[in-house]
A protein has these predicted regions:
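Conserved HGGG/HGGXW glycine-rich cap/lid loop of the alpha/beta-hydrolase fold
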Residues: 38-91
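Active-site loop/oxyanion-hole signature of alpha/beta-hydrolase fold enzymes
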Residues: 74, 83-115, 119, 285
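Short glycine-enriched nucleophile-adjacent loop
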Residues: 121-132, 138
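Flexible "cap/lid" loop of the alpha/beta hydrolase fold
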Residues: 129, 137-167
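Conserved alpha/beta-hydrolase catalytic His-Asp/Glu region
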Residues: 149-153, 169-231
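Short beta-strand/loop motif that positions the catalytic acidic residue
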Residues: 233, 239-241
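Conserved alpha/beta-hydrolase "acid-adjacent" motif
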Residues: 246-252
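Catalytic histidine-centered segment of alpha/beta-hydrolase-like enzymes
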Residues: 271-284
Length: 297
């Protein structure tokens, strides 16, 4: 893949990133290109790394392109085949999940361990219900259940109607206002993450992409999940949360545990919504221990 740092507009966004952080990420982007497949008339891009006997379907967050996940992809690919898709501009969760299933079929993967963090956790919860036979296990990280009757859902619907009227620049600012509160403190250690965040928001995502992200969020909140949804599904579930994550206060964490009473739950401390960055090794260890336990059961 072409060196993104040769683009002055993009390189400027990474100017404050120390070379020790930037160079491994730069090499990842150069050495690993997206694969492409058309599913239902929609073109999908995705990473396909590793060659282990089992596969992981890694579902990225709201910004739709799995650049944030690069270091996890490399480490998980040491033991598993890893499929990490970008999200195209489709407006429903069903369409998104149908595309994901199409990628797996195209790659000859019958079942995968499905892992979703934040917005990717929304997608994962729909996927396991729509394609239970393709879901070997479910890892949900820093995400939440649906609240179809909540006032916040009504606000999301209004926001989507307004967003359609806005130019792309205003739409990016609106999305950043929503996401900024989930970002960690801007320290030197987090410089790369903030560079990636800026590139995704300012360069990578089009107006159509952002509108589809919002539309799928509204669509997700219309679902009504119950603890009985997966009663006949034989897979196991891991839920990871952090006690000070603004998206999952205590009442939401309790709702989540009631929705998935069979789940193994791990609670991190002090890292908010950014545990996968701030405690990357510990984050991966919890997931790997869970998957290793499946093989030992």
């Amino acid at each position: 893949m072409a060196d993104f740092m040769l683009e002055p507009k993009i390189a400027k966004l990474y100017r404050d990133v120390p070379l020790a952080q930037l160079e491994p990420y730069r090499q990842f982007r150069i050495e690993h290109d997206f694969k492409h497949v058309t599913v239902g008339g929609v073109t999908w891009e995705y990473y396909d790394l590793g060659s282990g006997p089992e596969a992981r379907l890694m579902l990225t967050g709201a910004l739709a392109i799995p650049y944030f996940d690069w270091h996890h992809l490399l480490r998980f690919a040491e033991t598993h085949r890893v499929i990490a898709p970008c999200y195209p501009a489709v407006d429903t969760m069903d369409a998104l999940c149908d595309g994901l299933a199409g990628i797996l079929r195209h790659e000859g993967i019958e079942r995968a361990h499905v892992q979703g963090g934040s917005y990717g956790g929304f997608v994962a919860q729909i996927f396991v219900r729509r394609y239970p036979a393709m879901t070997a296990s479910l890892v949900l990280s820093h995400t939440q259940p649906t609240y179809p009757d909540d006032e916040g859902t009504v606000k999301l619907q209004r926001m989507l109607r307004l967003a359609k009227l806005l130019p792309a620049g205003a739409l990016r600012r609106m999305l950043s206002l929503s996401l900024n509160r989930l970002m960690p403190e801007k320290t030197q250690d987090m410089a790369l993450q903030f560079g990636i965040y800026a590139e995704l928001l300012r360069v990578c995502l089009s107006k159509a992409d952002i509108l589809s992200i919002l539309a799928r969020t509204v669509d997700y909140e219309a679902y009504r999940f119950t603890p009985d949804d997966l009663v006949d599904w034989p897979g196991r579930i891991l839920i990871m949360m952090t006690e000070n994550d603004r998206t999952t206060p205590e009442e939401v964490r309790e709702d989540f545990k009631r929705l998935y009473p069979q789940a193994q739950v791990h609670l991190f401390e002090g890292t908010g919504h950014a545990t996968s960055w701030e405690q990357a090794d510990a984050y991966r260890a919890v997931i790997n221990d869970f998957l290793n336990g499946l093989n030992e059961a």
